[in-house]
């Protein structure tokens, strides 16, 4: 047994770090070291068993006599699950190491230094304001990084987030008030997101952030705090505060009023800062090509960029599979790509979950189309039976005070069709605004005549084969919907004990999570003998027909053949003996209610017991005596309990952990009721679907879902497909009445008296044949029920092509290539499509299934209208004010009580509304978030960061077009001309790598890999390096070099925009249309231009990459030195000291690039062994090259020495304070261990800082 020793102190953040890591180990594939989950011990380990002096917490003992590991960093890394920190050597793994190191060496000391004074642990002479300043300095890099990232190293919490969050736990609890949290808004958002993850919450509970009011109890070790201040000191501090207040007031006044003589800001400058004011105003009829002949606007504006392109794409037919070929049947060596959209429900508008699905699917579709494949992405909408009927009923009640029964079936269905027309158009509008390259001429609705015919055909065929059958069984019944629902439409709410839940239709909450015991008197017993049973649903005792005990239970052997008396009914209940009873639970006796419990139903079948149903479809009691008759089920619960008490049969009530089944549509408590329904036999179809995955005919990605697939298929039950609704496909089955005395009348559960048909006439002919009578003796009554929505959705891959008719589309596009959807509907939809496709067409409906993660909000919460975190993607695209978000709630179907709760959620998450981000930024951001298998905690602020990326693309292209010049003519091909410079070769090499990573990422559905490769190329390589290096070349006298650079630059723009196009179709089209073409017959649009492939971009150049990597290493070192010495406005000379001639030659080759990138003066390579000039600061660029930056003449040595001496004195004082603090009486015994460790780290840092200061002092002394 492994043991994790931790501190019980609630603020012991090193121990908390270990405990959270252990939680992640439990939730994942186990601890990274491969051992068992450790036992937690809230005390130090015995000193006799540890190899280090106690107490050193946290500590992990890996089994008796095993390895000991201590200290938060080591223990957390050992407990953290393998694979969640990125593969070794990967970018993610490097980022994890970087931020863990930063948390331990920078954040922890700064956090402790700022927090300890607030806890009464300030040392002598310690300045709290300076400590807060140090914390702010440590938070700044974190704030900048988190501006564009949800987590520190990837799309889910890693060890880096764990280290940083626990380091900042004390400041967020005790120091950082609301105003400070606004300054570090990104850090605060990230901190809140992390601590709301289940693994963090399990350890930390609800983290309450510091409100600004503090009441802190003196902590142990308080004897080392500073003595009380003298009157003189207090007076001095009061003066300081007074000066500070005056200064702040002066600043506030200056901000509100311009200084004398100062001009007010010009309106046009204000407009320039506002990114949303630039619009496209040229008269362009819908469907005509946008005019891009004018000057590019100064900055990127989504409104300007996205105007006019989509109607033109649609009108030109770019999204149709026929584009560029005589017909869809024409052979294409590139192949066919077909995918159907998961048809969104017509229950309302699309949300960000739909936007994620759309972004992934459209990027894949555009990639396949640009690769030259015959590509079809088929649109459609789903009628969503239950969901739509519920929404429309709510709307009718809210607006007109009517329910559907008052309106009547036909009138109600007309209202639903109106709703569908309105919402369907809205959904298609949203999809178009998202840039979806769907073939709208093939759009369909699941209740269109073509698709309805497929549904009828499928039902009739399956019914004729006996796969669909009618049976009376227990079903999941929603009394609110007045309909049966399937198993996977039932949510399970776990209760630990007594809980009051809101139930639709009841004013007061209903009690659950209790076990009620009561007695049945044994019939004919002289001793007043009784049998005590217990139940969580006491109202169902009115439907009891027996009491069951175990055959081997000695307590009841004497009761064989006997009965008990029901206290409220004129019937006796036999005592039956059945193996299903657990003798150890309760009294070992169980009440049997076959009509309202699945286990009881099976017992009843074995013992031939009557099933007495005591509830109608609305949950009111029937078949019971007064006073219970007609009572709603949960009112009856109270009445039965009172009656039992009155008769002296009540025996007790106690808390009982249980699971309450809830309808996921109505939130009603589901009742098991006996009802005749239509079922699909799933056994054989499930075996076939499971075998298809086993054989590899069907791939499910991520592969982790395959195990779940097999488990579900192996344990599948028959599927109830009838719903007691009005909206949906009416079941094409008819109850038969035969007007012939020789044929007895039938009953509903008897399947022989039901017939299916494509038409009523066909059904009548079949019925006549079945009963051997003429058709005129047959009367038919069509079933009032409709089919489960998932039945028609399961036919979608071939119903859209008109199956069973053999159309051209069906022969070309079925089976499809890919099914892409969220993992939450793997069994709702994907499994049904596979089973029905194999059964009806003898083909798999698609070859691959890719399941993306589920979108949650920035705090990890499920999207819910009542939480106010359901976001319309158009609000992210266009932006919306907080009031606008509130107004949407008022126009929704939310109950008034939920509206205020939702408003609070919106105020907390979007205090300033949602900024305009644009479609491209939203799409790119969603794909960048998509990590296989993990849910996505979406922070809208991060999407804004990708809008800034769009602006970078815009400015880079604008600069590049100026550099190319008006008369520029690109080469017919992108082949290098042979005269490329080193940096030309380098950027081509990096571009080739981006092309490789993009194609491999698309093939593997690794969207973050693709977005990272493209983002890095454009931002860090093209903009930050190549364009900067290009400026002196384009302005120079070497025309050959300039021409060669222009061709390379054009290639970068051409290939780079094509790479980005699947993710960012609007901005890339806008920029691509402004580029000159290589050939006159080039494609009209970027969306049908060939996607770059490695064979086209075979420019990998390791030699150039090594050279530029050295240049960039030198540049980073020079920039760091310039920052250290505040040389922001000067260009200091730089001397490179190399270890060998090869490095020297390489450094010489890149010296001009270093000069440009580092803003240096002369960049010279020193001869081997030659000394550097006097007065240089030194830094290391690599193990083969050091930098000497000339400071002589650029800085005042005497002044710098003065500053360094002051800095040295302060560092010495700080070191002395820490040493005195650690030597103080009671320090090791009373000060928390984590504080001791923080002090030790801070002392090491201070001593290292002193050594650096001494080196700098020595340097400047030589310059005097």
From Swiss-Prot:
<dbReference type="InterPro" id="IPR036282">
    <property type="entry name" value="Glutathione-S-Trfase_C_sf"/>
</dbReference>
<dbReference type="InterPro" id="IPR002303">
    <property type="entry name" value="Valyl-tRNA_ligase"/>
</dbReference>
<feature type="modified residue" description="N-acetylserine">
    <location>
        <position position="2"/>
    </location>
</feature>
<feature type="region of interest" description="Disordered">
    <location>
        <begin position="218"/>
        <end position="296"/>
    </location>
</feature>
<dbReference type="InterPro" id="IPR001412">
    <property type="entry name" value="aa-tRNA-synth_I_CS"/>
</dbReference>
<dbReference type="Pfam" id="PF00133">
    <property type="entry name" value="tRNA-synt_1"/>
</dbReference>
<keyword id="KW-0007">Acetylation</keyword>
<feature type="modified residue" description="Phosphoserine">
    <location>
        <position position="527"/>
    </location>
</feature>
<keyword id="KW-0648">Protein biosynthesis</keyword>
<dbReference type="GO" id="GO:0004832">
    <property type="term" value="F:valine-tRNA ligase activity"/>
</dbReference>
<feature type="modified residue" description="Phosphoserine">
    <location>
        <position position="437"/>
    </location>
</feature>
<dbReference type="InterPro" id="IPR009080">
    <property type="entry name" value="tRNAsynth_Ia_anticodon-bd"/>
</dbReference>
<dbReference type="GO" id="GO:0002161">
    <property type="term" value="F:aminoacyl-tRNA deacylase activity"/>
</dbReference>
<dbReference type="InterPro" id="IPR004046">
    <property type="entry name" value="GST_C"/>
</dbReference>
<comment type="subunit">
    <text>Forms high-molecular-mass aggregates with elongation factor 1.</text>
</comment>
<dbReference type="InterPro" id="IPR002300">
    <property type="entry name" value="aa-tRNA-synth_Ia"/>
</dbReference>
<dbReference type="InterPro" id="IPR037118">
    <property type="entry name" value="Val-tRNA_synth_C_sf"/>
</dbReference>
<dbReference type="GO" id="GO:0005524">
    <property type="term" value="F:ATP binding"/>
</dbReference>
<dbReference type="GO" id="GO:0005829">
    <property type="term" value="C:cytosol"/>
</dbReference>
<dbReference type="Pfam" id="PF08264">
    <property type="entry name" value="Anticodon_1"/>
</dbReference>
<feature type="compositionally biased region" description="Basic and acidic residues">
    <location>
        <begin position="234"/>
        <end position="248"/>
    </location>
</feature>
<keyword id="KW-0030">Aminoacyl-tRNA synthetase</keyword>
<feature type="short sequence motif" description="'KMSKS' region">
    <location>
        <begin position="862"/>
        <end position="866"/>
    </location>
</feature>
<dbReference type="InterPro" id="IPR033705">
    <property type="entry name" value="Anticodon_Ia_Val"/>
</dbReference>
<feature type="binding site">
    <location>
        <position position="865"/>
    </location>
    <ligand>
        <name>ATP</name>
    </ligand>
</feature>
<dbReference type="GO" id="GO:0006438">
    <property type="term" value="P:valyl-tRNA aminoacylation"/>
</dbReference>
<dbReference type="InterPro" id="IPR013155">
    <property type="entry name" value="M/V/L/I-tRNA-synth_anticd-bd"/>
</dbReference>
<keyword id="KW-0067">ATP-binding</keyword>
<keyword id="KW-0597">Phosphoprotein</keyword>
<feature type="compositionally biased region" description="Basic and acidic residues">
    <location>
        <begin position="260"/>
        <end position="275"/>
    </location>
</feature>
<dbReference type="GO" id="GO:0005783">
    <property type="term" value="C:endoplasmic reticulum"/>
</dbReference>
<keyword id="KW-0436">Ligase</keyword>
<feature type="domain" description="GST C-terminal">
    <location>
        <begin position="89"/>
        <end position="219"/>
    </location>
</feature>
<dbReference type="InterPro" id="IPR010987">
    <property type="entry name" value="Glutathione-S-Trfase_C-like"/>
</dbReference>
<dbReference type="Pfam" id="PF00043">
    <property type="entry name" value="GST_C"/>
</dbReference>
<feature type="compositionally biased region" description="Polar residues">
    <location>
        <begin position="218"/>
        <end position="230"/>
    </location>
</feature>
<feature type="modified residue" description="N6-acetyllysine">
    <location>
        <position position="645"/>
    </location>
</feature>
<feature type="short sequence motif" description="'HIGH' region">
    <location>
        <begin position="344"/>
        <end position="354"/>
    </location>
</feature>
<comment type="similarity">
    <text>Belongs to the class-I aminoacyl-tRNA synthetase family.</text>
</comment>
<dbReference type="InterPro" id="IPR014729">
    <property type="entry name" value="Rossmann-like_a/b/a_fold"/>
</dbReference>
<keyword id="KW-0547">Nucleotide-binding</keyword>
<protein>
    <recommendedName>
        <fullName>Valine--tRNA ligase</fullName>
        <ecNumber>6.1.1.9</ecNumber>
    </recommendedName>
</protein>
